[in-house]
Amino acid sequence: MDEWKDKVILKEGESLKHDRSFCQGFMQEEDVELYSIVRSDGSVSGAVKVTDHTAVNGFRRTLHVVQTDNEGATVVDKSWRA
């Protein structure tokens, strides 16, 4: 499930730090991963939320990545079928 990393926009010196993962939905059908975007000096410049949803009926998967900056502005918002 690392194909979403190609959709995130990182500046030079920035990297992703995994914060936490959890499942949600009435049948735990959606996996959510939260990341911080960290500069080389250790300060946080944004956040990334990745969701991997498996439809209960049909078992289709939809991936969604949302990247925001420190002000909350959306930098990336993409969804696709896996």
Please describe what each predicted stretch is.
Residues 1-82:
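Eukaryotic scaffold repeat domains enriched in small/polar residues
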